[in-house]
UniProtKB/Swiss-Prot annotation:
One of its GO terms (molecular function) is beta-galactosidase activity. This is Beta-galactosidase 9. SUPFAM superfamilies: (Trans)glycosidases, Galactose-binding domain-like. The lineage of its organism: Eukaryota, Viridiplantae, Streptophyta, Embryophyta, Tracheophyta. Residues 1-30 form the signal peptide. Pfam families: BetaGal_gal-bd (PF21467), GHD (PF17834), Glyco_hydro_35 (PF01301), SUEL_Lectin (PF02140). Its EC number is 3.2.1.23. The keyword Secreted applies. Ubiquitous, with higher expression levels in siliques. Glycans are attached at N37, N463, N485, N496, N527, N785, N881. GO terms for biological process: carbohydrate metabolic process. The keyword Kinase does not apply. It is found in: Secreted, Extracellular space, Apoplast. Keywords: Apoplast, Glycoprotein, Glycosidase, Hydrolase, Secreted, Signal.
Amino acid sequence: MAESIRTFSLQWRILSLIIALLVYFPILSGSYFKPFNVSYDHRALIIAGKRRMLVSAGIHYPRATPEMWSDLIAKSKEGGADVVQTYVFWNGHEPVKGQYNFEGRYDLVKFVKLIGSSGLYLHLRIGPYVCAEWNFGGFPVWLRDIPGIEFRTDNEPFKKEMQKFVTKIVDLMREAKLFCWQGGPIIMLQIENEYGDVEKSYGQKGKDYVKWAASMALGLGAGVPWVMCKQTDAPENIIDACNGYYCDGFKPNSRTKPVLWTEDWDGWYTKWGGSLPHRPAEDLAFAVARFYQRGGSFQNYYMYFGGTNFGRTSGGPFYITSYDYDAPLDEYGLRSEPKWGHLKDLHAAIKLCEPALVAADAPQYRKLGSKQEAHIYHGDGETGGKVCAAFLANIDEHKSAHVKFNGQSYTLPPWSVSILPDCRHVAFNTAKVGAQTSVKTVESARPSLGSMSILQKVVRQDNVSYISKSWMALKEPIGIWGENNFTFQGLLEHLNVTKDRSDYLWHKTRISVSEDDISFWKKNGPNSTVSIDSMRDVLRVFVNKQLAGSIVGHWVKAVQPVRFIQGNNDLLLLTQTVGLQNYGAFLEKDGAGFRGKAKLTGFKNGDLDLSKSSWTYQVGLKGEADKIYTVEHNEKAEWSTLETDASPSIFMWYKTYFDPPAGTDPVVLNLESMGRGQAWVNGQHIGRYWNIISQKDGCDRTCDYRGAYNSDKCTTNCGKPTQTRYHVPRSWLKPSSNLLVLFEETGGNPFKISVKTVTAGILCGQVSESHYPPLRKWSTPDYINGTMSINSVAPEVHLHCEDGHVISSIEFASYGTPRGSCDGFSIGKCHASNSLSIVSEACKGRNSCFIEVSNTAFISDPCSGTLKTLAVMSRCSPSQNMSDLSF
């Protein structure tokens, strides 16, 4: 067996080299397809003269590193996607007016070329407003400083900048020969984004803006169709598309346009202090199947991969650093099972139906019951002969239904769709999950080879490996710290001062307290109070550099008691943003910091109007300005050794060095011991962190897939920290001595920070004899030639570790009537005694395996006349460790 594993490893390396060469060649040649045109009719997009049913995977390139892109694209294709969809992020590409950035995570051309080299198409959503839970909705903050500007309306300054950027992107794609008519992957573009949600706020100017945006886009000569999503008044030559949890009832505003679903929300975003969203795979598959059943032709998962809001890119306010979104690929690019696998099966079933779906101009409708219906597609196939496909739906949320269709009986589980690619046999039902379930395991770091000498730096306690026992600390100054401050009479709006170069803005004023004030307070009780009509997101109030208190909220009234001493006192206000507003009308007016009046109450002679006081302003932190989080500049700061018994302190910088974990599994920092702040590794900004507990109530004990989904249904993680693990991409790590720097705002213990790896360590499969046959069997020559009946094919359990991993052990296997679910299986009354040995022989030491669910596979029938199920629980381990295992 060890020899076979070594052979497998060699074969895998050779295969990887071949794949790399195949990918690299078209990138060099600049051509990915034979040039083709894209048009559309009422039924579908027409690609190279043929109607297509398309599945799209939403991937935002800046939410991953370039080193991750190829794997994400490959897994999307493996999962059945035809298209990748992404926004274009204006504030990432033009952070300073006229200065463009197309490097690193913003190397858009490279991302598009990788998509083309994989054989997938691209839907490029230029916007340039994107929403996307992205900082300021993708708009660069400098845009709001242009005199007279109003965003997203018939406003000349805005239209000028928008046209300039959209033209820049279209020209960039054309110059790189990335449009389909040039042999590239781009088949469709988008202008604006969900403008219909806010259009009424702008009146007639909004309607005029829609017409202008469409005309401007079409005038660029991109040569592919343009769409507008959630735009019922989209002009005739722009396709209006649907966004939402369900779009099977959507109809475009013209009979000449196809039904497109640009955002299928397969999960939801998360706010600090919120629970985690979860959309069941069964409901998501139901929504997609219903969409194609009722005439849809293009559907995109928002998101297929969510990724990470690195740096300060998260929008909000208060959106967390993780953008996992409960997507089919998780934040790190690992498959989320069973969602990824169940959707892969769904896509395969839809592809089997595609000849019939494109042959018919519209489906034939047939009522099967009070809440049951069929849609039948039939016509002439491209290669001759008749084609037929049918979708049987049961929209009853509670009861299964037995229906008759074409003379045959079918059982439809509640809230499900059965897909019949030949109008006779069921290839897939949305409520019957045959895909494996994966359980993500988070493991303490194993030092990489060659780094064993630093093991003494790792502290072990309660089976936790902490990142380091050696930390340095540096106190961030409270208040004005540099010469680049300025003084102004009155309170200024936060963004007008910071230009979003930092989350933080210091305000300082001098408060004079008389002896009479002191006597007045002694006689009348409490001291003075800072009162501000409205503030966002975080306000901290200091008196003479001592923290008086803090307030968190979104445009909430701020009232903070303060205590002064007699004489002159420094009143310091620190405002802080936690992601700029990314959704809504009039974004340019939203701003940050304070609104309304600010006053200081409780003085003997009355309130003090702080709005008219003289204030000194300082943007950002001294540590930020000195770039002490970078490898180049951190040694210039005056760090001191942090004692292990040091008390938590506010406004502290911490640094240490660590070696990366061995292997290729995704790396995370566990920051549960910290309070709130920001983190950097080797100068790369990991993002904001915040150890805030979600509400205790609101999570369902059980998640029922049946019935319409919303973001509050099936949530998880109630009563726990919203986020504790923060992704550190492997490409940002060096072989040893990686610099970790944190800025801690509220107080935490860096000695309990740990570095961990995440992988799909546990796989489970549970499939019964009544399950449908594997989708791949429909494409075998025996079935196509008619020498095999699909009904004679047994279902299978399919187990598949992540790349670079193999099945190291079978923890449980039972063919019969097993009880329980993944990580909790037990043997039932009926059990084939050879289950464990049969499954182990088929799977152990392999990256993936198939086990037939049949008496034949297990040699005999353990309980005649009983419907049997195969349940398996296995573990995956890195393949390089397999040589240490005995078989």
